[in-house]
């Protein structure tokens, strides 16, 4: 896990984004998914230029307000701070509905339920300290192995969602050394 911390800490843009998100003081907020995954994949492929962000996934957890409009308001606040970043904000207290799960207990639980393991990662700055959450194999992540999380594996009844996502994303074109595991 130290290697992941070191990658994030050494990237001033990533730290800046994490600090901007922290400044909003959203409950249980993190930056997740491709923001971190792509940095790791770029590094293991030896890329010196960063893959541009499709979006920066900001997540938070507020079970008392499931109205999607609040997410748009937070996106606007982030754009007001820095409009050059493609912000995407989602309340994880309502995202369980997307894949017919029980309501998540917090943001980390939601991240653990992401489709594939390398995407099920999040980071934040909290009280000036970097925190990273990743519940899957760090060795697999650092070796470019893409596999479904337990919630989308062959026995889950949702494996087709994983396969559809892998086919749609076409990650092997950007990162040809990835290994896809079932």
Residue ranges: model-predicted function:
Residues 1-182:
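Catalytic cores of the polymerase beta-like nucleotidyltransferase superfamily
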